[in-house]
Structure formats: structure tokens, C-alpha cells
């Protein structure tokens, strides 16, 4: 018999039911579990797939550039960034009637278009691109790079070019290559681009390939560099009256330490950012020369880890055995990488709005909201993935013999204390926060708002004051005119910082009060509960008192039959599954908070947030209900407008979300019976029964149905909020 899908599993390919297809898809990327898989082939397949991933990323960015150059209004937007709406791409839709065509024809376009809320216009403008020709050039270049990576991926699967396992496990060489080669040199190259192209362009000087080698980025060229007078490069920065993109008010400095924002663009100074990238480059290039490879000098990772034992002997053997454990476990490495990337992505969300790096981004409110929300959701998914792979590590790769009494073993030994402390923190936060919200709700319902319990976040306000925010009157550190830090800041470093932090037109260190105090603790509840579920899932993945042999069952199992009773819902996968709901819940609160605080800030009615955010009805009525009105009016008795697409998406998102419950709340037997009844009917229906199936139809497994339910819940949840966010923000601010 010809081999059927999946080729990687002989057992599955012979399964006579539709389980073959579903389990085949589910395990397609679990290379470790495939037939005849060796360690060497595993590493090589993953390595080659990285090139495919990079090719897709470059193709995608190339597509962004291409569509904006072809169908966008980049040049017109550059002439007036505050009033022209940036176009992402044209819409060709045969269903559009005349009202729709008119509603979606905007941004100076001749036909229906989508508006860009991704911030790419601001980014490309900041880094010195000005014409459609520039965009096409970038697009073609990235297309070429994409093809190059596809070829590289194919090449590294050929016998002559396949790296050996020892090459993959050479930690020091990889560190050197990633630190110096990737981070260091790319940061240096980016500094070069900023200094040679972006900064001159921001001062009205057009540098392209034809004059790159003749246009001096600084009047004195490399003279000060070789003379050791580096401070010359910081002298004569752009003035506060500088008009971005022109020579009016422009200076000559290329590497500065001004702090604060460019008054016109409301973004960080380009010369500050060039300085930052140069510093990063220097640090990382040095860091990439620290590890021992060919010359027998430098650090050995194994020696560093073996040496890390706590003094006194009472805290175990520290990091002994960790090197081999990490170096031989791809899941451990992936878990660490995802945890780092998740934190970085969330930091990007926080910094994109508080310290906007791109010109005019701060004035494009819808883009600000979209970027914040996007990065927080991505961070949530990446972080939960980190714990999932941590749990898989404990099941598949952890060796108790190699890790006797080291930090990993001690985590497992202390798991009851860790889990119960997290549980206690979650309970404390949940009961107290909800108690305060509900108390305040009742007081408002009974017409006695003055009896609310309103707690000022004094510690957070003190921290803001220490960083220079004068509003609260704490008079401490940077907010005290007598402190040495304050005096040094006037001249030596970041003189623009104090102006920025005390300026109400940006989002740096927003003024906070009782509403912020409450929602902060609600978010803390969400974070601690999500962490509790994920940490418990990983620490109990190998076994628990209830099920000591859990690791023999693998990462995901539904139950172990009636014999042991009560072993359902305790696989590591189930913990991950439950945690995703809590993660989405938490990010919902985070994004609601951010968005509501900012729309009141942008509209100049911060009192609305301050007064309504202290009780639950305020959130439901004055944030969700009030801001969904434009959305629901995408269609109305008078026709339609440009928000109609978001009205559709809002409805569709609710539909997808609700569909998730069909999979989550009913169990497998119901579907199996239904399928058998439908199959019976099919076989007895004329004409229909001419169509037969090769695989006997069976219901999804419990775990698979949960995955399908979770996917619908997540996608619907995100679609619904995305439509709400973009429509409510763009409906107010255009």
C-alpha cells in the first residue's frame, strides 16, 4: 500500500480513522517523536527551518514596502505627517457599492484604501526614506535577501553542508557569533546608517549611494575620532526650533546625550539614538570576545556554571551540572529564549508609547494604541510558550542523576512551597482587589460616592518623584532642586529629561491615583495567577503525589482511566491550556487600562478615567459601552461609514469567540454520537452515499477539542478587541 500522510509516523499512517489526519497535523513539528529521528537529523532540520523562518520575515517586510510604494501615499504623507492619513494598501472588493467606495476612499487616494496603523510610515520617514523609489529599492533588496535565505536553508540540508552535532553544541562559538557578529556588528551598522543617512536627511541633506562616500556626516569628519576629542561629536545639537527634515534650526552633532523629545516630532532625538546604538555595539562586540574558542583564552561556560555554588554549603550545589543539562536540551534552550523574548516584547510595548522613537508617532494615537496592544498580546503568547517548553524539558530531557542537589533539583524539591506561596499571593490580590472594587460599586449604586475606599499609590508616586516628576511635591532626588543628581542633570547628562517628564503632552510617567492603584493590583492578580498555573504545570510535569509516574504519560494526556480516579486535567499541557485563558484575561485588563487612560489623556478629560475607574460599573459603562458606540454605528439607518469594516469585525470576533465554547463545554462522547448518527444518515441517503470516506470519521480527542476551543476563544477575543480599539480610537481622532 502506498504510504499515506503522515510520512513521519508509520503507526499513525496506518490508523483507519480520521485520527490519522488530526494527530498527523498535531505532531508534524514535534520532530523528536518522528520515526527514525536521530539527534543529528533533529538539529539539522531545526537549523534549516530557521532559514525558512527568516526568509518568510524578509518576504513579509518586502511586501509591506512594496505595497506602500505601489498603492500608498508615502511621499504625500512625508509633506504633512500630522494631517495626511497613511495608506497601507488599496482595497479591491467587488461587493462594494457606491457608499462603501466613498467611505473607504481617503488619504488622498483615488479609490478605496486601508489606513496604516502599524507605524511603518513613521519608521521609514525617521530612518531617512523619502520617496517611493526608496521604498521599492528596499523591497527589492529584501526580496533578494529572502531568496538568499531560502537557498541557505536548502544548502544546509545537503550532505556536504550539514553541520555536525558538535558544532550545534559549541556554546562558546555560538555566544561569540551571536554577541559580536549579530548584535554587535548589526548595531554598529545601524549606527552607521543613522549617522550617514538618517541624521543628514532629518537636516534636509539628501544622502544616497551616489554621494554616500563624499557627504561628510560631521563637518570635522574623522578628525576628532583619531584625536581622541570625541566630545566634539556631541557639540552643537539640533535646536528646539528644529523643523524635522529641513536645515532650519539644525545642528551638526551626531552622537548626543540630550534626553527628552524633539519638540516638533515628539520623538527621541535621532542623535541620542545613534549614540545609544553605538554604545550597544561597543558593549556587544567586546562581549563577543569573552568566551574561549580557538586560542585557549577567555571564559568557558561550563567552568563558570560549575563554579557557581552558594557559599556556606546549605543551599546545595548551585549550578553544577547545568551546562550539560541546558546544552543537551533543545526545550530548555527554547524555554530560555522565549522567556527572554517575551520580556523584551512587553518592554517594547511599554517603551514605544512612553519614549516614542519614530518621528510623529506620538501624534498618531490609533497607531500608538495598536502597537501597544499588539506587542502585549504577542508577549503573552511567547511567555506562556516559555513555560510550556520548560515543562516539556522536565518530562523529556531532565536527568535527576546529572542534576543532584543543584538549582533545578532544588526547585523540584521545594515545589510545594513555591506553588503554595504563589497561590497565597493570588488569593490575597484577588480577594482584596475585588473587595475594593465591589465596595466602591455598591457605594455608587447607593448614591454615596464619598464612601468609596480610595487609596493613593504613594510608593509609586514617590518613585515617579525620585525620577524627577515634580507634581506630587515629594521634593526627593531628581525632583529636588538641591540634589547633586538634579544639578548634574542640568548640563552633564540628559538635560531634556526633566522637561519631558514634567510635560503633560506625552506619556512619560503618567500621573496616577486611586483608579491606577486598583487596576495595578488587578493586573498583579492576573500575572500571579497565570504564573501560578504555568509554574505548577512545569514543576508537577514529572509527577505529583496524586500521580507519581506522570512523566511516563508524556506532555499531554487526557486522563488515566477510571482505575486511579481524578487524573484528568493534570497533564502539563492542561496547565498551559488553562494559563492561556488567564494570560488573555490579564492582557485584556492591561490593554483596557492603557487605552482608557490614554484616550482620556488625548481628549483632555483625564477626570473621566480618574473618577470612573475606581469601580467596576465605571469600567463597563464609561470605557467599554461608551467607546463601542462609534463601532456599532458603522452601519446605521443613514447608511454606512469607514468604521463599518470594524463593526463587521467586532461581530465576527464575537462569533468566533463564542464558537470556542462549543468545543470547550461539550465533551467527546456527544460529538462521537453525533458523528455516528450523521455517518448513518449519509450511508442511507441516495446520491450522497456514492461519496465514501477512506478514514472512519471519529470525534476529536479531548485534548484536541480543547486546543480547537482555545484557538477560537483566543482568535475571537483578539479580533473583538482589535476592532473595538481601532474603531473607538480612529473614530475620535481620525
Swiss-Prot record:
GO terms for molecular function: 4 iron, 4 sulfur cluster binding; chlorophyll binding; electron transfer activity; magnesium ion binding; oxidoreductase activity. GO terms for biological process: photosynthesis. It comes from the Eukaryota. Belongs to the PsaA/PsaB family. The keyword GTP-binding does not apply. The chain crosses the membrane at residues 46-69, 135-158, 175-199, 273-291, 330-353, 369-395, 417-439, 517-535, 575-596, 643-665, 707-727. [4Fe-4S] cluster binds at residues 559, 568. It catalyses: reduced [plastocyanin] + hnu + oxidized [2Fe-2S]-[ferredoxin] = oxidized [plastocyanin] + reduced [2Fe-2S]-[ferredoxin]. Its EC number is 1.97.1.12. P700 is a chlorophyll a/chlorophyll a' dimer, A0 is one or more chlorophyll a, A1 is one or both phylloquinones and FX is a shared 4Fe-4S iron-sulfur center. This is Photosystem I P700 chlorophyll a apoprotein A2. PsaA and PsaB bind P700, the primary electron donor of photosystem I (PSI), as well as the electron acceptors A0, A1 and FX. PSI is a plastocyanin-ferredoxin oxidoreductase, converting photonic excitation into a charge separation, which transfers an electron from the donor P700 chlorophyll pair to the spectroscopically characterized acceptors A0, A1, FX, FA and FB in turn. Oxidized P700 is reduced on the lumenal side of the thylakoid membrane by plastocyanin. The PsaA/B heterodimer binds the P700 chlorophyll special pair and subsequent electron acceptors. PSI consists of a core antenna complex that captures photons, and an electron transfer chain that converts photonic excitation into a charge separation. The eukaryotic PSI reaction center is composed of at least 11 subunits. It is an enzyme of class 1 (oxidoreductase). Keywords: 4Fe-4S, Chlorophyll, Chloroplast, Chromophore, Electron transport, Iron, Iron-sulfur, Magnesium, Membrane, Metal-binding, Oxidoreductase, Photosynthesis, Photosystem I, Plastid, Thylakoid, Transmembrane, Transmembrane helix, Transport. PANTHER family: OUTER MEMBRANE PROTEIN, OMPA-RELATED (PTHR30128), PHOTOSYSTEM I P700 CHLOROPHYLL A APOPROTEIN A1-RELATED (PTHR30128:SF19).
Amino acid at each position: 500500500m502506498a504510504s499515506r500522510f503522515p510520512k513521519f509516523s508509520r503507526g499513525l499512517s496506518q490508523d483507519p480513522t480520521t485520527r490519522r489526519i488530526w494527530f498527523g497535523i498535531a505532531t508534524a513539528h514535534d520532530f523528536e517523536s518522528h520515526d527514525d529521528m536521530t539527534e543529528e537529523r533533529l538539529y539539522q532540520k531545526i537549523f534549516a527551518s530557521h532559514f525558512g523562518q527568516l526568509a518568510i520575515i524578509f518576504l513579509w517586510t518586502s511586501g509591506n514596502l512594496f505595497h506602500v510604494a505601489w498603492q500608498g501615499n508615502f511621499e504625500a504623507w512625508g509633506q504633512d505627517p500630522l494631517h495626511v492619513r497613511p495608506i497601507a494598501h488599496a482595497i479591491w472588493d467587488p461587493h462594494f457599492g457606491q457608499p462603501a467606495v466613498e467611505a473607504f476612499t481617503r488619504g488622498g487616494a483615488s479609490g478605496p484604501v486601508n489606513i496604516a496603523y502599524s507605524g511603518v510610515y513613521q519608521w521609514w520617514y525617521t530612518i531617512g526614506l523619502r520617496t517611493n523609489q526608496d521604498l521599492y529599492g528596499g523591497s527589492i533588496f529584501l526580496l533578494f535577501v529572502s531568496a538568499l535565505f531560502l537557498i541557505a536553508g536548502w544548502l544546509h540540508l545537503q550532505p556536504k553542508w550539514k553541520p555536525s552535532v558538535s558544532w550545534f553544541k559549541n556554546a562558546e562559538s555560538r555566544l561569540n557569533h551571536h554577541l559580536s557578529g549579530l548584535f554587535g556588528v548589526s548595531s554598529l551598522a545601524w549606527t552607521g546608517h543613522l549617522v550617514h543617512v538618517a541624521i543628514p536627511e532629518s537636516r534636509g541633506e539628501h544622502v544616497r549611494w551616489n554621494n554616500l562616500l563624499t557627504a561628510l556626516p560631521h563637518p570635522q569628519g574623522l578628525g576628532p575620532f583619531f584625536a581622541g576629542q570625541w566630545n566634539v561629536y556631541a557639540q552643537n545639537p539640533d535646536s528646539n526650533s528644529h523643523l524635522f527634515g529641513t536645515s532650519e534650526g539644525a545642528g551638526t552633532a551626531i552622537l548626543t546625550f540630550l534626553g527628552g523629545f524633539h519638540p516638533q516630532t515628539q520623538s527621541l532625538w535621532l542623535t541620542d539614538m545613534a549614540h545609544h546604538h553605538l554604545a550597544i555595539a561597543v558593549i556587544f562586540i567586546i562581549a563577543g570576545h569573552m568566551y574561549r574558542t580557538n586560542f585557549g583564552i577567555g571564559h568557558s561556560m561550563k567552568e563558570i556554571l560549575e563554579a557557581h555554588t552558594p557559599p556556606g554549603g546549605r543551599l546545595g550545589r548551585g549550578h553544577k551540572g547545568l551546562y550539560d543539562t541546558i546544552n543537551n536540551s533543545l526545550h530548555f534552550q527554547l524555554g530560555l529564549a522565549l522567556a527572554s523574548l517575551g520580556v523584551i516584547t512587553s518592554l517594547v510595548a511599554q517603551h514605544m508609547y512612553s519614549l516614542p522613537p519614530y518621528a510623529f508617532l506620538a501624534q498618531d494615537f490609533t497607531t500608538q494604541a495598536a502597537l501597544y496592544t499588539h506587542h502585549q498580546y504577542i508577549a503573552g503568547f511567547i511567555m506562556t510558550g516559555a513555560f510550556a517548553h520548560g515543562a516539556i524539558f522536565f518530562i523529556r530531557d531532565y536527568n535527576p542523576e546529572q542534576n543532584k542537589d543543584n538549582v533545578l533539583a532544588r526547585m523540584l524539591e521545594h515545589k510545594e512551597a513555591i506553588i503554595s506561596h504563589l497561590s497565597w499571593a493570588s488569593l490575597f490580590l484577588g480577594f482584596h482587589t475585588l473587595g475594593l472594587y465591589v465596595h466602591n460599586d455598591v457605594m455608587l449604586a447607593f448614591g454615596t460616592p464619598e464612601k468609596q475606599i480610595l487609596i493613593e499609590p504613594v510608593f509609586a508616586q514617590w518613585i515617579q518623584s525620585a525620577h524627577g516628576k515634580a507634581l506630587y511635591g515629594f521634593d526627593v532626588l531628581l525632583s529636588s532642586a538641591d540634589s547633586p543628581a538634579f544639578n548634574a542633570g542640568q548640563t552633564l547628562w540628559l538635560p531634556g529629561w526633566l522637561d519631558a517628564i514634567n510635560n503633560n503632552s506625552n506619556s512619560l510617567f503618567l500621573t496616577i491615583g486611586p483608579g491606577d492603584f486598583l487596576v495595578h493590583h488587578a493586573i498583579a492578580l492576573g500575572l500571579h495567577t497565570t504564573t501560578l498555573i504555568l509554574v505548577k504545570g512545569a514543576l508537577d510535569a514529572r509527577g505529583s503525589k496524586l500521580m507519581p509516574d506522570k512523566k511516563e504519560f508524556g506532555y499531554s494526556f487526557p486522563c488515566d482511566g477510571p482505575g486511579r480516579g481524578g487524573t484528568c486535567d493534570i497533564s502539563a499541557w492542561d496547565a498551559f491550556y488553562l494559563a492561556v485563558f488567564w494570560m488573555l484575561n490579564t492582557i485584556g485588563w492591561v490593554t483596557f487600562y492603557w487605552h482608557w487612560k490614554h484616550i482620556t489623556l488625548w481628549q483632555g478629560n483625564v477626570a473621566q478615567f480618574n473618577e470612573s475607574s475606581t469601580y467596576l460599573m465605571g469600567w463597563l459603562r464609561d470605557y467599554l459601552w461608551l467607546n463601542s458606540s462609534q463601532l456599532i454605528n458603522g452601519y446605521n439607518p443613514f447608511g454606512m461609514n469607514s468604521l463599518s469594516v470594524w463593526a463587521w469585525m467586532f461581530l465576527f470576533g464575537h462569533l468566533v469567540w463564542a464558537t470556542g465554547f462549543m468545543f470547550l463545554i461539550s465533551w467527546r462522547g456527544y460529538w462521537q454520537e453525533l458523528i455516528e448518527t450523521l455517518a448513518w444518515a449519509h450511508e442511507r441517503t441516495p446520491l450522497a452515499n456514492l461519496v465514501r470516506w477512506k478514514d472512519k470519521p471519529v470525534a476529536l480527542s479531548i485534548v484536541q477539542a480543547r486546543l480547537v476551543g482555545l484557538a477560537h476563544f483566543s482568535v475571537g477575543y483578539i479580533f473583538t478587541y482589535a476592532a473595538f480599539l481601532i474603531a473607538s480610537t480612529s473614530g475620535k481622532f481620525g
